[in-house]
Amino acid sequence: MYGSRKDSSGSRTPERVSYSPSPSPSSYSTNSSQSSSGRSRVRTAARSVAGVFVACFTPPEEEAPHHSSSAFGGSDAFSSTSDVSGASDSTDGKRLHRSIYTVKSDSTHSKEPASIKFTMADINKATKNFSPVLKVGQGGFGTVYKGQLQDGTLVAIKRAKKSMYDKNLGGEFQSEIQALSKVEHLNLVKCYGYLEQGDERIVVVEYVPNGTLREHLECFNGNVLSLDSRLDIAIDVAHAITYLHTYTDHPIIHRDIKSSNILLTDKLRAKVADFGFARLAADAESGKTHVSTQVKGTAGYLDPEYLRTYQLTEKSDVYSFGILLVELVTGRRPIEAKRELDERITARWAMKKYTDGVAISILDPKLEKSDANGLALEKILELALQCVAAHRRNRPTMRRCAEVLWNIRKDYKEQLV
């Protein structure tokens, strides 16, 4: 992605496709100090639904004929056709207390976000004509290069595959870039500018040198992420997505929240990447509830309701965040095809263990099975279960997720004293 490392694990990164595990609905309190009887009720409710996750590659029963299946193999980064309909899921408090989720520029954020329209000459100079030595990532969307601007600023330059360009989407691309020009948050990778010329679509973003969350979970650098650090990362990501959903001039849906899109700084603070081509959400003031669009995303993280209805809302990001929470505490990828059948879909396996009262057995083996870790683990899984509810109406908002995680971290630190 936008870090300095390439994925050398040999594990196959989940492809961006249309199918994912589909947990059943659940809705209950997110109070981190919930009583044991309350937890029992949660487990009972969850136990009744934990076994009905569908296999991640089972196609939906009905498919809309006007949606092209070719969209499922690539990124949402460079193409989407959409229309808007319905009334907003959650508008309470929208754009209130904006200062909580914004940050003033510092030395690493010296440029105005997305304010520059680069030329091809600028890009060629920054990447030394797309030198293979400077390539730091590759995926369905295209290739990412490390580059340096004239003033010495290090950047990541994301170049789309030529096959993903669609001249009919030029206006939409430009309108979304303009919306993103107003986005600035400490936990979001900054978008410095872009290029749209002929069959080239390129975005220039902040360079974050310490690799991805996925790499750190697999200990590529030899260091184990503590549960304390994992909670910090979860909160950082929750704040970033809350900002996109609630505190921007127009709500933005990330649409591809996953561990390989979370970059870490030298101090292990998280920055959400790959939001430069996210979808603009339905505008609450217009009375719309969702954006209808082709399904794009990554296997294992995809919202089953979005997959079934083609209706995209902020709650699709909440579902992906729930999968990310499970990934954080287990250390496993969302889909691990080489494991035993009942463990291949990590969220299904983890929720089954949680509802059976043996949540500690799914804790990342690199972490200590202490009382404090076990208690925090159960609370995190409780929140994750709500996030992956099959119906979006039963999922919390990202702001609520951030609040719950703050309480979990507070309680966890008190346990450690």
Name each model-derived stretch:
Residues 1-4, 415-417:
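A positional/structural detector of protein chain ends, strongest at the extreme C-terminus
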Residues 84-417:
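Conserved eukaryotic protein kinase-like
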